[in-house]
């Protein structure tokens, strides 16, 4: 993909040999995200209700410019991931949304959140400003997989669709016992 940065009078943006704007304080950059999530949870054997007892995230953050802010980003990402894993669902029928409003879209609240233990691993990036890496998006990715695997270990059954609700767990246990 190419972008044109010119006008009839010449280039609008002067570029260095790598194609980056010259003297730009923060040119676009990428760095790989390395992180792991561990979750300790329990599943009620009768209702299938999931309770998260402990949630731990270890994430390579490059250089931690503001560790408290980074922990907040990780906690927010984990909250999004827990919602994806356990409660958030948009129901469709033939392309039509059946959720009447957002009260039917169950996002986790602070009362639903476990304490998230953050382990910040600092391995500065050569690409990021001051060696920092992006920290906001990566924590959203792992929670559904970590929670699904922990539920499978706790119950002996694997639910294949998100969100993993108490009803889906109970049905999977019934099917497994047949």
Regions found by a protein language model. Give the residues of each.
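C-terminal catalytic domains of large/alpha subunits in multi-subunit enzymes
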Residues: 1-178
């Amino acid at each position: 993909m190419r972008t044109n940065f010119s006008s009839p009078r010449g280039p609008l943006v002067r570029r260095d040999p790598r194609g980056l704007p010259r003297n730009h304080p923060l040119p676009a950059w990428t760095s790989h995200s390395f992180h792991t999530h561990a979750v300790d949870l329990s599943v009620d054997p009768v209702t299938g209700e999931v309770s998260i007892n402990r949630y731990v995230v270890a994430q390579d953050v490059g250089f931690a410019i503001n560790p408290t802010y980074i922990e907040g980003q990780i906690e927010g990402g984990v909250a999004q991931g827990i919602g994806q894993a356990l409660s958030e669902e948009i129901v469709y029928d033939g392309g039509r949304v059946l959720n009447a409003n957002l009260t039917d879209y169950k996002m986790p609240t602070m009362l639903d959140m476990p304490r998230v233990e953050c382990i910040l691993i600092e391995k500065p990036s050569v690409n990021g400003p001051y060696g920092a890496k992006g920290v906001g998006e990566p924590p959203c990715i792992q929670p559904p997989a970590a929670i699904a695997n922990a539920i499978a270990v706790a119950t002996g059954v694997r639910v294949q669709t998100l969100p993993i609700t108490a009803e889906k767990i109970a049905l999977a246990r019934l099917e497994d016992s047949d």
